[in-house]
UniProtKB/Swiss-Prot annotation:
Name of this chain's protein: Glutamate-1-semialdehyde 2,1-aminomutase
Gene Ontology cellular component annotations, sorted alphabetically: cytoplasm
Catalytic activity of the protein: (S)-4-amino-5-oxopentanoate = 5-aminolevulinate
Source superkingdom: Bacteria
Name of the encoding gene: hemL
Species of provenance: Pelodictyon phaeoclathratiforme (strain DSM 5477 / BU-1)
An annotated Gene Ontology molecular function: pyridoxal phosphate binding
Length: 431
C-alpha cells in the first residue's frame, strides 16, 4: 500500500484555497473515498506522486496521452516553440493554418474548423452555431452523455456530474433546461418521439458517437446512421462530440470508424497533446456563419496559441507517421482478454465495454447500453476495486463512470502486471 503522507498534507492545504481542494470534481476521490494522489512527474506510461510512489497510468490525462506522457518528439517541438517562437501573440499565426488544413484532411466531416481552448468551448460554440444556422432553440442530447460544463449540457449529464450523483446542476435556468431535451442513448425511437413532439424546433442533436463519460458505451450498429437520416429529413444539425473518442478510436475519429458523417464535429484532448485545446468544425455552409465571416459570435484570447498548436500538430504528425492504431488494438485486446479470463475464473459476470484503446469494466451483470443500465453498477464495490488497483501501482480514473485509456507506451509487461493486479482487485472488491 503506497504511503500518501505528502498527498494528504497537500489536499488539506488545497481545501483552504480551492473549492473541494481540486480544480475538477472527480479528482477529489469522492466516489471512491480516500486521499487524492498528487502527481509530481509523468513519463511514458508511468506517473510518480509527491511521496515517490510510481503508478502505471491508465488515465492518460483523461484521454490526451494516446502516445504516453512526455513523448520525445512532442517535448522537443514544445521546447523549440518556447525558445524560438513564443507562447502567445493575440494575432493570426501560420501554425493555425497548418493544423486546420491537417484536421480537414483527417476528419471526414471537416471542411472548415475553428480552434478554441477546451472541449467545453467547442461544444458550446457548436450548439450556438447550430442554433444560429437553423433559427431554432432546442437541442437533443442523450442521458448520461457529457459535453462539458456548459449550462445546456448539465441536464442529466455524465462524467463528474454522474460520478458525484448530481447529473443536474443548480444555476442552470429553467429556460435553458426547457431547451435541452434528453433522449436515451442507442434508442432511436426515443429521439424520434422528441423530434415529433417538438416539430420544427430542434436545432441540433449532439452525441458522443462512443459515449465515454458514462463509462464506455459503444453506439449500436445502425444507431448513428439512423440519427443521420433523421437529422437530414428534419433539417437538424447533427453534432458528433469527438472530444474524447476523436483520434482515439481511429485517426479520423468514430465517424470514420462507423462511416457516418455529422454536420459538425467537436474535438479536443488528443489534438492538444496534453495542453488545453479544443476545436469545432464541419460543413462549409454552416461554418461560414461563424464571425467574422458570419453573424454567430465566437472568440478566445488564447485560441490558436503556439504552444497548444505545437503539441497538437506534433501529436497528429506522429499518429500519421507511425500509425499506432493496430498496435493499440493488439494491446487493448490483451488487456480485455486478460480481464475477461479473470472474471471467468472468479465466476463473475461483470460487463466490460471497449472501443479501440478506451474501455470500462462495469460492476454490474446488466449489459450496459445506456445511462439507465450504466447506473446499475455497484459503485461501492468499484471503490474497493479502485483502491486495490492503486495499492498495486495501477492508477485508474477514480470513478466507475470514466474510461480506461491505453497508450502506445504501455508494454506487454505492463499489461501483464495490470491483468494480475485486476485479479487481486476483483478478489479484494468482494464477490
Amino acid at each position: 500500500m503506497p504511503q500518501l503522507t505528502k498527498s494528504a498534507e497537500l489536499f488539506e492545504k488545497a481545501k483552504k484555497f480551492i473549492p473541494g481542494g481540486v480544480n475538477s470534481p472527480v479528482r477529489a476521490f469522492k466516489s471512491v473515498g480516500g486521499t487524492p494522489v498528487y502527481m509530481a512527474k509523468g513519463s511514458g506510461a508511468y506517473m510518480t506522486d509527491v511521496d515517490g510512489n510510481t503508478y502505471l497510468d491508465y488515465v492518460g490525462s483523461w484521454g490526451p496521452f494516446i502516445l504516453g506522457s512526455m513523448h520525445p518528439r512532442i517535448t522537443a517541438a514544445l521546447e523549440y516553440t518556447l525558445k524560438n517562437i513564443g507562447t502567445s501573440f493575440g494575432t493570426p499565426i501560420e501554425m493555425e493554418i497548418e493544423i486546420a488544413e491537417l484536421l480537414c484532411k483527417i476528419v471526414p466531416s471537416l471542411e472548415m474548423v475553428r480552434m478554441v481552448n477546451s472541449g467545453t468551448e467547442a461544444t458550446m460554440s457548436a450548439v450556438r452555431l447550430a442554433r444560429g444556422y437553423t433559427g431554432r432553440d432546442k437541442i437533443i442530447k442523450f442521458e448520461g452523455c457529457y459535453h462539458g460544463h456548459g449550462d445546456s449540457f448539465l441536464i442529466k449529464a455524465g462524467s463528474g456530474a454522474l460520478t458525484l450523483g448530481a447529473p443536474d446542476s443548480p444555476g442552470v435556468t429553467k429556460g435553458t433546461a426547457m431547451d435541452t431535451l434528453n433522449a436515451t442513448y442507442n434508442d432511436i425511437d426515443s429521439v424520434k418521439l422528441l423530434v415529433n413532439e417538438n416539430k420544427g424546433q430542434i436545432a441540433a442533436i449532439i452525441i458522443e458517437p462512443v459515449a465515454g463519460n458514462t463509462g464506455v458505451i459503444p453506439a449500436k450498429p445502425g444507431f448513428l446512421a439512423a440519427l443521420r437520416e433523421l437529422c437530414t429529413e428534419e433539417g437538424i444539425v447533427l453534432i458528433f462530440d469527438e472530444v474524447m473518442c476523436g483520434f482515439r478510436v481511429a485517426l479520423g475519429g468514430a465517424q470514420s470508424l462507423y462511416g457516418v458523417t455529422p454536420d459538425l464535429t467537436t474535438m479536443g484532448k488528443i489534438i492538444g497533446g496534453g495542453l488545453p485545446v479544443g476545436a469545432f468544425g464541419g460543413k462549409r455552409e454552416i461554418m461560414e456563419r461563424v464571425a467574422p465571416l458570419g453573424d454567430v459570435y465566437q472568440a478566445g484570447t488564447l485560441s490558436g496559441n503556439p504552444l497548444a498548436l505545437t503539441a497538437g500538430l506534433e501529436t497528429l504528425k506522429i499518429l500519421i507517421d507511425e500509425n499506432p492504431y493496430p498496435e493499440l488494438e493488439r494491446k487493448a485486446v490483451i488487456l480485455e482478454s486478460g480481464f475477461n479470463d479473470n472474471l471467468k475464473k472468479l465466476g463473475l459476470n461483470y460487463v466490460q465495454n471497449r472501443v479501440g484503446s478506451m474501455s470500462c469494466l462495469f460492476f454490474t451483470e446488466t449489459p450496459v447500453v445506456d445511462y439507465s443500465t450504466a447506473v446499475t453498477a455497484d459503485t461501492k464495490r468499484h471503490g474497493k476495486y479502485f483502491h486495490s488497483m492503486l495499492d498495486q501501482g495501477i492508477y485508474l480514473a477514480p470513478s466507475q463512470f470514466e474510461a480506461m485509456f491505453i497508450s502506445f507506451m504501455h508494454t506487454d509487461e505492463d499489461l501483464e502486471k495490470t491483468i494480475k493486479a485486476n485479479y487481486n482487485a476483483l478478489v479484494a472488491s468482494g464477490q
